[in-house]
From Swiss-Prot:
Expressed in the URX sensory neuron, the ALA interneuron and in additional interneurons, pharyngeal neurons and muscle. GO terms for molecular function: G protein-coupled receptor activity; olfactory receptor activity. It comes from Caenorhabditis elegans. This is Serpentine receptor class alpha-10. The chain crosses the membrane at residues 29-49, 62-82, 108-128, 149-169, 193-213, 244-264, 281-301. GO terms for cellular component: membrane. Residues 1-28, 83-107, 170-192, 265-280 are extracellular.
């Protein structure tokens, strides 16, 4: 998302018309629509796997469901914005005074898009907090059931609703944009702060997840818990869950960082780039949909991987006669 300079009228300039009707824009819409459809399909599969595979604690499950909700809200609204732009690029290709949108017209769609972006990222941080609780207070966390996830999800939703409202404080909505994907000009400074905040949260999440993984590995190896099945199960559950959350955080960090870096670079060199090319590049620099689709994709992959590892070890245990030492080694691998 990036701001566009306001014009004195709603009519598009020659460069803006080139942007609105360009082949690159139309190809981008088609690709992003395919990504959105893949997101819907993978979400359905991820929900099914989450239901039948008891890998995560109920609190973590609540947060993962919330993440999938935000991912799909983002996919739906972005697909609507993109395809509206595609239709207008054909039907209004010879009407420069109708093809542009006012920021007031785009207000609702832009707010929902920001809500989706914020939710995906805020909830990732919520998942990290959930993993932190499972590591610091494992016994209490285990007895609280879904409560931590519910509380964190409510906070995430509230902050995500507040994000577009705060960004738009005092904005007169008196400029024009190519479509509802772009921030209003007067909101750009707060939008930049918003993007920096998201990047900071994702970096913090990755850092904390690595610490949590290390802590759980150390705790799992502790002699005092070696013969207590419940405690070892809690440590193993926390470790597996945190590893999966870390993979998701890393993919979202990559998507957001690519977006922020590329858009910042484009803004710094905006005066050197024709406006039609500049805004097309901003479209292509929007990598958030790829970060979003990685959530259900990685959930499916990692959960299936954990299940396959367990089945392989169990099959090896039951398929041959082992010495006591080999049997203990197999059991140790099963725990891993």
């Amino acid at each position: 998302m990036g701001p566009i300079t306001a014009n004195s009228s709603k009519c598009a300039t020659e460069d803006q018309m080139i942007l609105q009707t360009s082949l690159l824009l139309r190809i981008n819409v088609i690709i992003m629509t395919i990504v959105a459809i893949i997101t819907f399909i993978l979400t359905y599969k991820a929900l099914f796997i989450l239901k039948i595979r008891p890998i995560f604690h109920s609190s973590t499950k609540i947060l993962l469901y919330t993440s999938l909700l935000f991912v799909n809200v983002h996919a739906v609204i972005f697909m609507v914005i993109q395809n509206t732009a595609l239709i207008r690029s054909f039907t209004l290709s010879d009407k420069p005074c109708e093809i542009m949108r006012t920021t007031l017209e785009c207000r609702f769609q832009n707010h929902v898009l920001i809500f989706g972006i914020a939710g995906v990222n805020f909830n990732q941080f919520g998942l990290t907090v959930d993993r932190l609780l499972a590591t610091i207070i494992p016994q209490s966390y285990s007895h609280m059931g879904a409560l931590p996830g519910v509380i964190l999800s409510v906070l995430v939703v509230a902050c995500s609703i507040a994000a577009p409202l705060i960004i738009a404080i005092g904005d007169p909505y008196d400029d024009i944009v190519p479509n509802c994907f772009f921030f209003p000009e007067h909101s750009a400074p707060r939008a930049n702060i918003f993007l920096v905040t998201l990047s900071t949260l994702v970096i913090t999440s990755i850092f904390l997840n690595f610490i949590i993984i290390y802590a759980n590995k150390k705790l799992e190896k502790g002699c005092r818990t070696r013969f207590y099945v419940t405690q070892r199960y809690q440590k193993r559950e926390a470790l597996i869950s945190t590893r999966i959350i870390s993979y998701i955080a890393a993919s979202q960090f990559l998507g957001l960082t690519l977006y922020s870096t590329m858009v910042l670079t484009l803004r710094l060199h905006k005066s050197m780039i024709p406006i039609s090319i500049y805004h097309n590049m901003v479209w292509w620099a929007y990598t958030v949909p790829f970060a979003a689709v990685s959530l259900p994709a990685l959930l499916i992959y990692r959960i299936n991987q954990v299940g396959s590892n367990r089945k392989r070890v169990i099959n090896r245990i039951t398929a041959k006669v082992e010495t006591q030492e080999e049997h203990m080694k197999s059991l140790k691998e099963l725990w891993a």
